[in-house]
Amino acid sequence: MATDPRKILVTCALPYANGSIHLGHMLEHIQADIWVRYQRLRGNDINFICADDAHGTPIMLKAQQMGITPEEMIAAVSEEHQKDFAGFDISFDNYHSTHSDENRELASSIYLELKKNGFITSRTISQLFDPEKEMFLPDRFVKGTCPKCKSEEQYGDNCDNCGETYSPTDLINPKSAVSGATPVMKDSEHFFFDLPQFESMLKEWTRSGSLQTETANKMQEWFESGLQQWDISRDAPYFGFEIPGETNKFFYVWLDAPIGYMGSFKNLCDKRDDLDFDEYWKLNSTTELYHFIGKDIVYFHSLFWPAMLDGAGFRKPNNVFVHGYVTVNGAKMSKSKGTFIKAGTYLNHLDPECLRYYYAAKLNSRIDDIDLNLEDFTQRVNSDVVNKIVNLASRNAGFITKRFDGKLSDNFVAPELYNEFVAASDRIAELYETREFSRAIREITALADKANQYIDEKAPWVLAKEEGKEQELQEVASVGINLFRVLMAYLKPVMPELAARTEAFLNETLTWECIAQPLTSHEITKFKALFNRIDPKKVEAMVEESKEDAAIEMAAKEKAEAEKEKANQTELDKEPIADEIEFDAFEAVDMRIARIISCEEIPKANKLLKFQLDIGGETRQVFSGIKSAYTPEELVGKHTVMVANLKPRKMKFGMSEGMILAAGPGGKDLWILEPHEGAQPGMRVM
């Protein structure tokens, strides 16, 4: 008896809206998409959503550096993110943003409900404050010397050199990473979510058996360490949502980020008549809710998020599926080595289905790191997908289309072998359901080996040359096509584009149920290449492009840092005071007040202006290199200061009888000295 379709809501962690998607992000989104596509293939009612995490200090500051608004920046990033995900066939039903009306309303209502129920407290805390930018500094925006190993330029929460963790106030010689100023301590009222009140509920949820063992064990460690109240507020200036009823107080990004799951789903519900938001999020909902996340954000998703939902009267997730990190060639992704590969860079060179297959061949239900070994990646995809699976179709299709007008045999001559393939469906289904994708791939490729063994033994290429073997040739080739059909039905969640091309070739939609019986007396279309081998040169080109991108990015970063450092320099930093002189040397310089009688440009002189100066009973001619800063009309009639006893200097355009004093670095940034009213031409400057 058929069961009703399951109603399932699936989310991926929200990518932060201040950078590009890379192959580390893609592990999670591919893992989730394979699971979602499998559920759709089995007829379940599933909705797959995501959004950009679009709030926080880093976004605010990066937008300032770019000279645009945060809204403009996150809109551009969202467009890039969605393009990359579409390029990898991630089949979201909705992709939204945490900076949305839906999310603002939900975050505010959840906060107010938590406050009403007694789960929000407030107290005054002391934080580091940037006196120049007039902003409180998050840990990562304070730099200084590590208190343990004394390494310089370390962040305010941990040392990259020795691994020590500490408070920003423990840093030696702390500096604001925003302005370079020395931060000061300043008090501010902050709001806290009272997480310890939910300890019993969280322990019960942990013991329910639905969480991964590693996650449950980690939560037990946190329980033993003691749960702490969670600071959910930030002070202005901040890019985010203001806390209802407060002034210049904003929700911390990690409060409204997970609520972004709800906001994205609410946005989807508003677009469709067949979805009810409350059905999926109400307390005791019978629908299923699953979050796919990386192991770096387990703390938020296994403690704060379910506690917030519970405290505000919503349902909790059925499970949080956690995966490990991605390494490349056995090491952390490296920009200098070209192994920090952006999704867009990958798509410039390689088929996204290659990565989907390779990740699937490595993924399991545990929190294991996945290594993308580029040499193994090439060999694995070429060996499994091209040589074993697609080759089944290419080896047999030509015989059917050329010799039998594209029609498969009326008889199926290998029922036992076919039944063995079909019998694997329950095992493979269970492996997909439990996210044991690598084991599912091993099952599928083992079947592919058996199919190729059958074709090798029957040798249709030999039968094609023998008279009277036409029927046997058609039957053998038809078996090969049918076995390929079963394999592609099993691979459809992993390689949807290859499956779509296969469906066009077979002239049939691949479903989990259709493979129960082989195709007989069925017409297929002319075979076209379904999948191309990975060319190692394209992999190399991808790595080289990643290196070039990293070099450009580093150069831009260094330029920005140099400009920032220059902007933070004092005038004495830029030009230190000259060596000391004796008073007699200073007294020898005769500076006088001068009135500018006339000023004119000199033909063919790029920098010089020609002056006639009244110094109280005497007129001097002076040439001065301030043409880039002033027009002659601006200067006539002004009083200024000149060195009157400088030895006259013969120049190309005439004799210069002194020097006008000006301040500034040069170019347009020059200012002549102008004395106060009352100073008369000829007066000596003392």
From Swiss-Prot:
Record text on cofactor binding: Binds 1 zinc ion per subunit.
Binding site for Zn(2+): C146, C149, C159, C162
Motif ('KMSKS' region): 332-336
Main location: cytoplasm
Cofactor(s) needed for function: Zn(2+)
Annotated CDD domains: Anticodon_Ia_Met, MetRS_core, tRNA_bind_EcMetRS_like
Cell location: Cytoplasm
Catalyzed reactions: tRNA(Met) + L-methionine + ATP = L-methionyl-tRNA(Met) + AMP + diphosphate
Pfam families cross-referenced by the UniProt entry: Anticodon_3 (PF19303), tRNA-synt_1g (PF09334), tRNA_bind (PF01588)
Keyword Cell membrane assigned: no
One GO CC term, this protein: cytosol
Short sequence motif 'HIGH' region: positions: 15-25
Origin: domain of life: Bacteria
Gene Ontology molecular function: ATP binding; metal ion binding; methionine-tRNA ligase activity; tRNA binding
EC number, as in UniProt: 6.1.1.10
Signal peptide positions (record): none
UniProt record similarity statement: Belongs to the class-I aminoacyl-tRNA synthetase family. MetG type 1 subfamily.
Role noted for this protein: Is required not only for elongation of protein synthesis but also for the initiation of all mRNA translation through initiator tRNA(fMet) aminoacylation.
Assembly notes: Homodimer.
Protein name: Methionine--tRNA ligase
Organism in which the protein naturally occurs: Aliivibrio salmonicida (strain LFI1238)
